[in-house]
């Protein structure tokens, strides 16, 4: 049974300030910029692009600075508040809304050039339905870049340890974290009719770039 929606909202509301502080960590900044570049290499501006589970907005803002029309959505009101504040302070034009991404998405059919879903899949109660909704929203030739915590138990990166510690601390709440590997994430994406362009494992996470 997946963890209830209120649980994730509670957790990420409480962690919003800590996630915003991570913005200044060189490792985090480099990862955000590299992720934004990866999508920018296959999606021409202005997109549009949706960042699902956008958190404090780092990826959405990185894409907006590259000339994309970006909408970031997240189930945590405080995370969205942090993202909006950062956009205003940095004078970056991006839209952020509070929305549960496990529900049907509020984007029209074939309306998006690109979708980011960075470290959100592990919390979605129905992963196949989530990917199917993304496919519905992508226009032909649009791209999805999705990442999830890596199942590789030998990894000891800070990110991998973060997710494993979270899973251990919240063990009384089932379904808090799901781990993936290249096979399971590729299969999940392909089963919903998307074509996998690239699948790779990075420290602590697995990522798939797919085309509609």
What is the predicted role of each segment?
Residues 128-140:
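A short glycine-rich, Lys/Arg-flanked "PGG" loop and its adjoining helix->strand segment in the class I
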Residues 116:
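A conserved beta-strand element that flanks and buttresses the S-adenosyl-L-methionine
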Residues 50, 56-103:
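Class I SAM-dependent methyltransferase SAM/SAH-binding core
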Residues 119-123:
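Short catalytic micro-motifs in class I SAM-dependent methyltransferases
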Residues 1-44, 62, 145-167, 203:
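Conserved class I S-adenosyl-L-methionine
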Residues 104-109:
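Short conserved loop adjoining the S-adenosyl-L-methionine
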């Amino acid at each position: 049974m997946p963890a209830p929606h209120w649980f994730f909202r509670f957790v990420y509301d409480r962690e919003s300030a800590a996630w915003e502080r991570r913005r200044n960590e060189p490792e985090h900044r480099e990862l955000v910029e590299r992720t934004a570049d990866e999508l920018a290499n296959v999606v021409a501006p202005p997109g549009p692009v949706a960042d699902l589970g956008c958190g404090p907005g780092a990826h959405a803002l990185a894409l907006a600075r590259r000339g994309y029309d970006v909408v970031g959505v997240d189930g945590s009101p405080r995370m969205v508040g942090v993202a909006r504040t950062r956009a205003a302070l940095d004078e970056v034009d991006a839209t952020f809304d509070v929305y549960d991404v496990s529900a049907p998405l509020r984007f029209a059919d074939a309306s998006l050039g690109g979708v980011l879903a960075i470290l959100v899949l592990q919390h979605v109660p129905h992963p196949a339905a989530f990917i199917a909704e993304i496919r519905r929203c992508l226009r032909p030739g649009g791209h999805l870049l999705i990442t999830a915590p890596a199942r590789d138990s030998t990894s000891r990166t800070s990110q991998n340890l973060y997710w494993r510690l979270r899973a251990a601390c919240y063990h009384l709440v089932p379904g808090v974290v799901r781990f993936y590997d290249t096979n399971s994430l590729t299969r999940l994406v392909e089963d919903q009719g998307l074509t996998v362009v690239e699948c790779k494992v990075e420290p602590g996470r697995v990522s798939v770039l797919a085309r509609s």
